Amino acid sequence: MNEQYSALRSNVSMLGKVLGETIKDALGEHILERVETIRKLSKSSRAGNDANRQELLTTLQNLSNDELLPVARAFSQFLNLANTAEQYHSISPKGEAASNPEVIARTLRKLKNQPELSEDTIKKAVESLSLELVLTAHPTEITRRTLIHKMVEVNACLKQLDNKDIADYERNQLMRRLRQLIAQSWHTDEIRKLRPSPVDEAKWGFAVVENSLWQGVPNYLRELNEQLEENLGYKLPVEFVPVRFTSWMGGDRDGNPNVTADITRHVLLLSRWKATDLFLKDIQVLVSELSMVEATPELLALVGEEGAAEPYRYLMKNLRSRLMATQAWLEARLKGEELPKPEGLLTQNEELWEPLYACYQSLQACGMGIIANGDLLDTLRRVKCFGVPLVRIDIRQESTRHTEALGELTRYLGIGDYESWSEADKQAFLIRELNSKRPLLPRNWQPSAETREVLDTCQVIAEAPQGSIAAYVISMAKTPSDVLAVHLLLKEAGIGFAMPVAPLFETLDDLNNANDVMTQLLNIDWYRGLIQGKQMVMIGYSDSAKDAGVMAASWAQYQAQDALIKTCEKAGIELTLFHGRGGSIGRGGAPAHAALLSQPPGSLKGGLRVTEQGEMIRFKYGLPEITVSSLSLYTGAILEANLLPPPEPKESWRRIMDELSVISCDLYRGYVRENKDFVPYFRSATPEQELGKLPLGSRPAKRRPTGGVESLRAIPWIFAWTQNRLMLPAWLGAGTALQKVVEDGKQSELEAMCRDWPFFSTRLGMLEMVFAKADLWLAEYYDQRLVDKALWPLGKELRNLQEEDIKVVLAIANDSHLMADLPWIAESIQLRNIYTDPLNVLQAELLHRSRQAEKEGQEPDPRVEQALMVTIAGIAAGMRNTG
């Protein structure tokens, strides 16, 4: 066993042992024995022992209803502990991320070694770094917040136990604390009883900021500064903070009727309240630290006679008073009280920055740089990264809601029906109104509740302090009028600045038309004047993959980006591409470094803006050290992509991708849309319907309550297939298309694409990862337990397809087995399979019992239902991504 993994294995086995003792104390020896038997059978089954595999199935089928929950919980909790150990391993000196902050050093050394790059060019690239991470409340974070806190503490214990020099009594204390934490987790219900509200989701986002990002961001900037000094002799300017955080929690109303204008207003206030709370703690530290007397004449002039004795403290105490007054006012507003704004209310970042920066400059000038560069510097950087709003909010709404609102308005005004007008007529009307000085909305108009909601949301944007709302994203954008309509509604609300409005192109057709839409918009003089040389466009990954399959979608995304980059470059517009990717492969997820380097050349010139979703937020930003690691990876990748962009693909490669795209899309849609057996098979072979019972996010799982696959959101669609281990959306169509191109004699060309074109090699790498997580015998077992025999041939057909796909991918990549070049991930999947397999078998059994009871008109047994929910959460932990 590789040395690197032995530390991980020993931690996993130690945590497993403690969990075993906890189970024994709580439920007795016999349950622990039952769990141990199942674990050993699973291990042996994985090693290829068919007799033990059969015994595993029989044992799990024969569990009594009383045994179901303890067994499901044992394996589910074990997987959470294994994930925690793995997370620690990724930041421990013995593990992976001994190397991650090194990413920056490695990248800088690589760039310095390129003869065509001067140090000045590299510095300029660093200065133009821009990374905006958009936290979204996707319902994929299955783990309850209370358990996440316990796992963070388990992580801290593992860190201290790694210290060889601790005394025996300290080691014993730490082991006792670990036992307490694992016992607390065991006796906590891991399934939420109620769906979180949008405000709960926003609070979850603030908790990530407080527990991890608040410390992680300044630490990352220190690391970046150190590497730049060492490699380029260059110091980061104090005001330079290339990373920002935005949130969709409380702002994303697309398909979520629970997010209203009032909710957004509340979340904006709550976010500002949390910012004052966190900055107050920082300022309190600075009040006690900055006791120095010597100051520059400028600082002494600023504080006057009153503050001359302790000028720095004087300024900090003043700032503290303003923060306290601001917090009290926000608290009253949150309780619904209407109060006049107090004097000194903090609404802009400059008001926080100026007194802090004045102290910084004075300390530097008086030879106290070592003090200036301590906590004060960290706070200054937090002002730049988080500031008064803490996290900015994006507003997202579906395009048809704006069209319907304008339709209702034009009908009321008696000037026709906007909804039925041609695109040219819509544009003419919108541009006329955008240029007009008179208001369009009549004062006494009483619109419908839906339209009122759209108008109220625009009102909230107009009232919010400038800078607290980052962008207005239009989902399902199809035409230039979709973008102009939002600008008109914002103008009518009285917004006094050019709010960034980003169309989101998310189906195959919309991606293919994206460049035409943006070209038309950029040809409108009024629009060019408004945007002042900057444009944001969002690329949807999940809906396009659900619409056309992963191969066709990824090529459409690439081509749309490529065309938009060239169009904007020609027009002299700085384009920011906003990537709406999920954590799972079927929703565009890929390891960050590979994903960024596989984008078209020039795609990161306007910075990187990307969604971080659900459980990925915890995996990538759950601890300050992991935050440093993740931000370092992004930084290295952006620098490399901008300074050493991937080559333009050859024309012949583009033609092959066009071909792969058509073949794979036809096959994918042939099954998903046209095969009459597909939807009944999907509904019975996966826990799709049961997933709806999980109180995950505040957003309904379907856009429309009735309807087939097309009405399902992308997340439950992926989630369901991940549960039964067929992982279908992440590969269906791709391998068949590759096979067809190989049969046409183009294998050597595909191999060259794999070697020399990051876009293509990343695609294949992602397919390999999906195949490594998929499991055909388990998928077959779900069929046998749950699916009508008439549909078995379809299941067999799909499994055969996957087997063929694996062969062709390995042949093109020249690999003997899956994940050959990422042994760390392969090891991690193997480690978890032993614990995930029993949960899969058990889930199929539970679905069988639950559906059987329903068929017989009985109420489902609550023990079965609860155990089922636990298996869903456990498998999600085992797969390390849900949707």
From Swiss-Prot:
<dbReference type="GO" id="GO:0000287">
    <property type="term" value="F:magnesium ion binding"/>
</dbReference>
<dbReference type="GO" id="GO:0005829">
    <property type="term" value="C:cytosol"/>
</dbReference>
<dbReference type="GO" id="GO:0006107">
    <property type="term" value="P:oxaloacetate metabolic process"/>
</dbReference>
<dbReference type="InterPro" id="IPR033129">
    <property type="entry name" value="PEPCASE_His_AS"/>
</dbReference>
<dbReference type="Pfam" id="PF00311">
    <property type="entry name" value="PEPcase"/>
</dbReference>
<keyword id="KW-0456">Lyase</keyword>
<dbReference type="InterPro" id="IPR021135">
    <property type="entry name" value="PEP_COase"/>
</dbReference>
<feature type="active site">
    <location>
        <position position="138"/>
    </location>
</feature>
<dbReference type="GO" id="GO:0006099">
    <property type="term" value="P:tricarboxylic acid cycle"/>
</dbReference>
<dbReference type="InterPro" id="IPR018129">
    <property type="entry name" value="PEP_COase_Lys_AS"/>
</dbReference>
<comment type="function">
    <text>Forms oxaloacetate, a four-carbon dicarboxylic acid source for the tricarboxylic acid cycle.</text>
</comment>
<protein>
    <recommendedName>
        <fullName>Phosphoenolpyruvate carboxylase</fullName>
        <ecNumber>4.1.1.31</ecNumber>
    </recommendedName>
</protein>
<dbReference type="GO" id="GO:0008964">
    <property type="term" value="F:phosphoenolpyruvate carboxylase activity"/>
</dbReference>
<comment type="similarity">
    <text>Belongs to the PEPCase type 1 family.</text>
</comment>
<dbReference type="InterPro" id="IPR022805">
    <property type="entry name" value="PEP_COase_bac/pln-type"/>
</dbReference>
<feature type="active site">
    <location>
        <position position="546"/>
    </location>
</feature>
<dbReference type="GO" id="GO:0015977">
    <property type="term" value="P:carbon fixation"/>
</dbReference>
<keyword id="KW-0120">Carbon dioxide fixation</keyword>
<keyword id="KW-0460">Magnesium</keyword>
<dbReference type="InterPro" id="IPR015813">
    <property type="entry name" value="Pyrv/PenolPyrv_kinase-like_dom"/>
</dbReference>
